[in-house]
Regions:
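Ligand-binding cleft/hinge of the Venus flytrap
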Residues: 85-91, 176-178, 182-205
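Flexible hinge/capping segments at coil-to-helix
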Residues: 145, 154-173
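A ligand-binding cleft/hinge motif common to bilobed small-molecule-binding domains
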Residues: 120-133, 214-243
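Short helix-initiation/N-cap motifs at beta->coil->alpha
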Residues: 97-106, 198-215
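N-terminal hydrophobic or amphipathic helices and topogenic motifs
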Residues: 1-103, 112, 135-140, 160, ...
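Periplasmic-binding protein-like
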Residues: 142-151, 233, 237-266, 287-293
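Short loop->beta-strand "edge-of-pocket" segments that line small-molecule binding or catalytic clefts
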Residues: 68-78, 165-184
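Short beta-strand-centered segments that line the small-molecule binding cleft or hinge
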Residues: 104-149
Length: 296
């Protein structure tokens, strides 16, 4: 017999659902160990907890309900057209507030949302470092949403279409807000090309979503910008791929198991979701739901 119980085994022992176990962990009411991203429960300590001492301690230590322990039904962070569509079509009841990945992280820290869309570039990948530094001891989980192709979106009537980032010099460049993950990606690409922001010719106005950036280019307010293939295709614009990024969802663990988010997850396993991703273009959804980091 193992000295440790898994979450499923403990839920069966307590005759509760697994999400109730996560609630008790989040409240600090259960003896738990975190090993390689998994929660394990020491059998002897659990038996003592069941014996009564743990129950009394749980009643004393359980925190009062607060906005942070029950975040509002909002998904914040980076914008994604496929995610925006899925939230509507799934009828999950989750509201969207897309104002950039960094803005979403700040809102999560303040307990203002149940999930955050992230595409923060890091030396060894995407998003994990940004999450680990802020939420190491809090009950959040980072799951993959999709991989997206990002590159230069430009007008089809440009005399000399860009073949690399350096070719945008002299063209009116459409920027995003500083909190947007795409601005972090742009900084990395500029560094790789040994370029600086001063080498760009930014238009005065910024755009706050992927589709708004493409709209600005299609209406002639800008010549080029860094965006995703799906947005370029929506507005019949030309596209030069530069990299593939991983867009993840950072989810409050309890909310992950609640009906609204589970409704979204169920919808995303249906054929209509895959068909929409294919129609939009530039998406790889084969890794949807993969856990990339488990906090707490």
């Amino acid at each position: 017999m193992s000295d440790f119980l898994t979450t499923r085994e403990l839920a069966a022992l307590l005759r509760v659902k697994e999400r109730k176990v996560y609630d008790l962990v989040a409240a600090g009411s259960l003896p738990v160990r975190r090993v390689t991203g998994k929660l394990l429960f020491p059998r002897k300590e659990i038996e003592s907890w069941i014996g009564g001492a743990g129950e009394a301690r749980a009643a004393e230590d359980a925190p009062a309900a607060s906005e942070h322990s029950q975040p509002p039904l909002i998904l914040a962070g980076g914008h994604d057209p496929l995610l925006e569509w899925a939230l509507r079509e799934s009828r999950s009841g989750i509201a969207a507030f897309f104002d950039g990945a960094l803005d979403g992280l700040q809102r999560a820290e303040r307990g203002e949302c149940i999930a955050v869309g992230l595409h923060v570039p890091e030396p060894d990948g995407w998003n994990v470092g940004a999450v680990e530094g802020r939420f190491r001891r809090e009950p959040w989980v980072l799951i993959e949403w999709a991989r997206r192709v990002r590159g230069l979106i430009y007008r089809p009537d440009i005399a000399r279409p860009p073949s690399c980032l350096k070719d945008v010099r002299g063209l009116r460049f459409q920027s995003r807000q500083p909190e947007a993950g795409s601005e972090l990606v742009l900084d990395r690409l500029l560094s790789e090309e040994k370029m600086k922001r001063a080498d760009l010719r930014p238009v005065k106005a910024i755009e706050r979503t992927e589709t708004d950036l493409a709209l600005a280019i299609s209406t002639g307010r800008a010549d080029v910008g860094l965006g995703i293939e799906a947005a370029a295709r929506l507005h019949n614009l030309r596209f030069l791929p530069l990299l593939e990024e991983r867009f993840d969802l950072l989810v409050w663990r309890k909310s992950y198991f609640d009906p609204p988010f589970q409704k979204l997850v169920t919808f995303c396993h249906a054929p209509a979701f895959a068909a929409r991703a294919a129609d939009l273009g530039g998406y790889d959804i084969s890794g949807f739901g993969t856990v990339r980091y488990n906090c707490c």
